[in-house]
């Protein structure tokens, strides 16, 4: 019992009491310039929330556009319908629709029932080993 206490005491005595100096990191001008250029170039891309809003409100916007409402009342991303779809936009749009389509299917299935339905093992865990 005395040995761990002595070991801790010696370790505390051996640690330096002075605060060592650390060099502050200053971003270089090249790094700052690169980040600014990167943000300027990719700032106008769609976020996932914008894409979801675009997919969810697309039929509503078509009906309001045909009714003669001014286009200045619409958000910035409403003009994307007139532009040709880029490959990235199609990829993200397809992935989002596939994800939404697959989600209810998974929740509806529930447990894997197998051939003979659910089985309760001896330890109380569920298994679908029926075949």
From Swiss-Prot:
Compartment(s) where it occurs, according to its Swiss-Prot or TrEMBL record: Secreted
GO terms for cellular component: extracellular region
Source organism superkingdom: Eukaryota
GO biological process: blood vessel diameter maintenance; cGMP biosynthetic process; receptor guanylyl cyclase signaling pathway
Annotated tissue distribution: Brain and spinal cord.
Prodomain positions: 23-109
Any GO MF annotation of the entry: hormone receptor binding
Primary localisation category: secreted
Swiss-Prot/TrEMBL keywords: Cleavage on pair of basic residues, Disulfide bond, Hormone, Secreted, Signal, Vasoactive
Cysteine disulfide links: 115-131
InterPro entries: C_natriurtcpep, Natr_peptide, Natr_peptide_CS
Family annotation (PROSITE patterns): NATRIURETIC_PEPTIDE
Signal peptide bounds: 1-22
Pfam families: ANP
Biological function: Exhibits natriuretic and vasodepressant activity. Has cGMP-stimulating activity. May help to regulate body fluid homeostasis in a variety of aquatic environments.
Record-stated family: Belongs to the natriuretic peptide family.
UniProt-recorded name of the protein: C-type natriuretic peptide 1
